[in-house]
Amino acid sequence: MRIVLITGISGSGKSVALNALEDAGYYCVDNLPPHVLPELARYLADGGQHRLAVAIDARSSASLDELPGLIRSLSLEHDVRVLFLNASTQALIQRFSETRRRHPLSGSPSHDANIGLLSSLEEAIERERDLVAPLAEFGHQIDTSTLRANVLRTWVKRFIEQKNNDLMVMFESFGFKRGVPLDADLMFDVRALPNPYYDHELRPLTGLDQPVIAFLDALPIVHQMIDDIHAFLMKWLPHFREDNRSYLTVAIGCTGGQHRSVFIAETLAARLAHDANVIVRHRDAPVDVDASSRLVTEVDRP
């Protein structure tokens, strides 16, 4: 059975992700107590259901400590994937304010005896971060701070389409002016490279467009940067595998996340497709939803 566990911070988009999985044919359950999960998986498997998605958050805080052990145990019999959704505190506060929803931990006792009850939304968010932080290491992280709901749905679909027999490497382009991604395991700054933005004909385009590709591809310094990053990844990927890592997010950043980072993320993803399962996604580039995230295969290699 394929089991997808969705966890993370309240307000980060778990409901959107769960709905996307339901549309993909998964049997979905929200806020399931972790200790019930093995029994539910057996029950559904006996009934012929082969895809289960479960959202777990701070509302199950009393039994969150059980979840890491359950993940290891379930992985012995099932294809278990963990999706950890995160967002900046500023983005979360704005979302709760817009929806007028109450945070699950608002008014709950603080872990600091000097504070008493968690009176502010920010305190509740930070308390929840502490509670769910141990789960982040088990899953693939997505920072939804700047994502539209339809983009998140697409990224979730790409996540479940990927094979699960090897390390999954996610190349993510972004713009520093919009903030660094919270989900990055490795981050490379390519702002030292010549910027197509200053060519008025290239400015409205992205690193997916042929004129920008031709501009950057003609520059030796761009290839030096790509070669150096690729060599670093090839050296250290075996060590990430030995550490039993399932997911690795490599963030490539330029100023606006539109030209250089997009081109380099695409090029690196194509190069690495022979050596790992690869997804490339573009956080800030003005591209259509389908182009914002895609699987990369060996046929994409240059």
UniProtKB/Swiss-Prot annotation:
InterPro entries: P-loop_NTPase, RapZ-like, RapZ-like_N, RapZ_C. SUPFAM superfamilies: P-loop containing nucleoside triphosphate hydrolases. The keyword Methyltransferase does not apply. Displays ATPase and GTPase activities. GTP binds at residues 57-60. It comes from the Bacteria. PANTHER family: RNASE ADAPTER PROTEIN RAPZ. One of its GO terms (molecular function) is GTP binding. Belongs to the RapZ-like family. This is Nucleotide-binding protein BamMC406_2713. Keywords: ATP-binding, GTP-binding, Nucleotide-binding. ATP binds at residues 8-15. The keyword tRNA processing does not apply.
